[in-house]
Amino acid sequence: MPRVMNGCFFSFEGPEGAGKTTMISKLESLLRERGIDVVATREPGGVRIAEAIRSIILNRDYTEMDGRTEALLYAAARRQHLLEKIVPALEAGCVVLCDRFVDSSLAYQGFARGLGIEEVWKINEFAIDGYMPSLTIYFDIDPQIGLERIRRNRGREVNRLDLETLSFHEKVREGYRELARRFADRIVVIDANRPLDDVFAETTAAVLSRLKGR
């Protein structure tokens, strides 16, 4: 059963190189300028234990990692992050901007790894205990464009998922699009192939509209 939250929980999703982190940073600044209490965070990570799990999941040396192991590690990191950071922020009435949440697991492990969206959801349903975003922004991008952005970004360390085949990243995109169809009331799709300013304008409009209506 969905939880009732004092604050407002937004998640931001997309394939590698979709520009989520940039959008969250810009949005955080804009909301703070408007006097809104904001907590920006990321998955996997955000708190000490989850960051330790992140270092395992994304380590380029662990190419032998099994898909189920990967899914379980993400869910474990998510649980700890939720309890330590997201829930306290929501209880304090803050706006939470989270770089990835449960939809990432459904798209990457459930769809692209072939574990099944329903099966991966069961793992995460136990982990999140009813906490779901009020709104999810999905940045849709051509995987080739996204991966090229990563290659050009010298400040970003290449991780294990970046090294997956183009076919894998195309499946991730298919997975996200399937989720957007299933959960159209929660997920807003934004074309991230466009210029940054256009993407940010549409992102801001979607978030402010939801905040105004709560």
Swiss-Prot record:
Reaction(s) catalyzed by this protein? dTMP + ATP = dTDP + ADP
What keywords are assigned to this protein?
A: ATP-binding, Kinase, Nucleotide biosynthesis, Nucleotide-binding, Transferase
- Transferase among the record's keywords? yes
Name the positions where ATP binds: 14-21
Please provide the Gene Ontology terms (biological process) for this protein.
dTDP biosynthetic process; dTTP biosynthetic process; dUDP biosynthetic process
Is this entry keyworded Kinase? Answer: yes
One GO molecular-function entry: ATP binding
PANTHER family in the record:
THYMIDYLATE KINASE (PTHR10344), UMP-CMP KINASE 2, MITOCHONDRIAL (PTHR10344:SF4)
Q: What is this protein called?
A: Thymidylate kinase
Source organism: Geobacillus kaustophilus (strain HTA426)
